[in-house]
């Protein structure tokens, strides 16, 4: 519940102070002289990090990584259910279902199907204060004119948040070795989306946190059901 209310509290802060989003995007925006065809008052320029080949390659790798991990998890879940009786690992199956359920409900459905397709917030690069054609819309606003695959919230940040959740399921013997690179990927992914002008700070923060909210809710639900079953035995 704490994560749930934290998400809404952060949304309220970003809505009340939209200058936070504008400020952090301005850190990565480089202005340029407009050409003769530009209308008077237009702002010209761009986000140079999006044109760096190394960053673009990293973004591609980080974008695909959660879904590669998910495919491996599906395979492991199928393996679990090929076992029966004493050889069936119920705990592993439960963890895999929570992890895959979080990815499906959070980044896939909530973020990419519901929020990004219906909230209409233009990305920074689409916004007139950063050289685009659309007006700025604050976090959570329905007034934006983006038509599809919009800025609120970041799907890649949500997937990165999901990867971070998996640390809880990593065996203790591997946790220290895996924690640092996984945490780095989880933080770098939303940071790059911000630096590319693809999302505002609120989009990446709320997208990342949304996966933790869904993960915590599913984990609490499964643990409650397991506790209820144990009490009935």
From Swiss-Prot:
Chief location: membrane
Record-listed E.C. numbers: 3.1.-.-
Extracellular side: 23-60, 116-149, 198-200
Pfam families in UniProt: PAP2
InterPro entries: P_Acid_Pase_2/haloperoxi_sf, P_Acid_Pase_2/haloperoxidase
Subcellular location field: Cell inner membrane
Cytoplasmic side: 1, 82-94, 171-176, 222-233
Further remark: In R.leguminosarum strain 3841 lipid A lacks phosphate groups, and both tetra- and pentaacylated species exist; the same is probably true of this strain.
Function: Removes the 4'-phosphate moiety from lipid IV(A) (a tetraacylated precursor of lipid A).
Descriptive protein name: Lipid A 4'-phosphatase
Native source organism of the sequence: Rhizobium leguminosarum
Lineage, top ranks: Bacteria, Pseudomonadati, Pseudomonadota, Alphaproteobacteria, Hyphomicrobiales
């Amino acid at each position: 519940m704490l994560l749930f209310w934290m998400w809404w509290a952060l949304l309220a802060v970003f809505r009340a102070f939209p200058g936070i989003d504008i400020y952090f995007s301005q850190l990565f925006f480089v202005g340029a002289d407009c050409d003769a065809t530009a209308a008077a008052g237009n702002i010209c320029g761009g986000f140079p990090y999006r044109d760096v080949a190394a960053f673009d390659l990293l973004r591609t790798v980080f974008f695909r990584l959660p879904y590669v991990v998910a495919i491996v998890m599906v395979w492991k879940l199928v393996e679990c259910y090929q076992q029966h009786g004493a050889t069936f690992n119920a705990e592993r199956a439960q963890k895999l279902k929570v992890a895959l359920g979080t990815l499906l409900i959070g980044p896939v459905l909530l973020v990419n199907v519901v929020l990004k397709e219906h909230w209409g917030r233009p990305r920074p690069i689409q916004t007139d204060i950063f050289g685009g054609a659309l007006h700025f819309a604050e976090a959570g606003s329905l007034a934006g004119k983006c038509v599809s695959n919009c800025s609120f919230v970041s799907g890649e940040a949500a997937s990165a948040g999901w990867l971070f959740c998996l640390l809880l399921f990593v065996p203790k013997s591997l946790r220290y070795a895996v924690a640092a690179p996984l945490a780095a990927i989880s933080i770098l992914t939303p940071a790059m989306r911000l630096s590319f002008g693809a999302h505002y700070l609120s989009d990446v923060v709320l997208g990342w946190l949304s996966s933790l909210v869904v993960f915590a809710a599913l984990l609490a639900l499964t643990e409650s059901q397991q506790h209820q079953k144990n009490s009935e035995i």
